[in-house]
Amino acid sequence: MKTESIHYQADGLDMIGHLAWDETATGPRPGVLVFPEAFGLGEHAKSRAERIAKELGYVALGCDLHGGQALLTSLEQVMSALQPLRTEPAKVRARTVNALTALTARKEVDAGRIAAIGFCFGGTMSYELALTGADIKAAIGFHSGLAVTSPGDAGQIKGKVLTLLGADDPGIPPEQRAAFIKMLGDAGVDWQMTLYGGVVHSFTNPHADKVGRPEFARYDAKADARSWKQMVDLFGEVFG
């Protein structure tokens, strides 16, 4: 497996993505965008991109969120940075669409077989990309926020949507899940949502416990493994 930092522009920022692929493979293969948690492109999203490349043979791009591959260090910084991304569709969509363009420009990538995944706010970003009408086969969110900027655009979604949540995640209440399901259902989207019992936020991140708020964010090995398998199964379905 090989990795490389690639540069692309989005929303006036110099984005630095983390590309991973199997250099021994020949011919174009599926590509996967990996959108990170709200703190930015760190080891969690990078390691997931590398795992996709190593285990599945796809080309995976860990996507920058804040420019310069910056990592935020406090919840106050995160809330400030996310405010415009949650309220101005053009800002969040520039980050997703331009990352897609950077990935599909690679000769190793089959531009007709692309999916987007994301963790926490990164999962929201995968849905935002789908809402642009981008030609992606699937948008997958792990413990992802469901409050998208333009729910009225759900009819533009071309691929399948898979949402993987902790049933006890305090940040994603039942009413938010219901509204998201209604949005997708009304638009005729092929969607799935799985709830993991007794699981809260950030269940895929082994370092979630460092937050020190186990009632909110906590790693769960079983939910991590189950959600990864569901992602792999959907890739097999949509990529053929």
Model-derived features: positions:
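N-terminal cap/leader regions of alpha/beta-hydrolase-fold enzymes
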Residues: 1-240
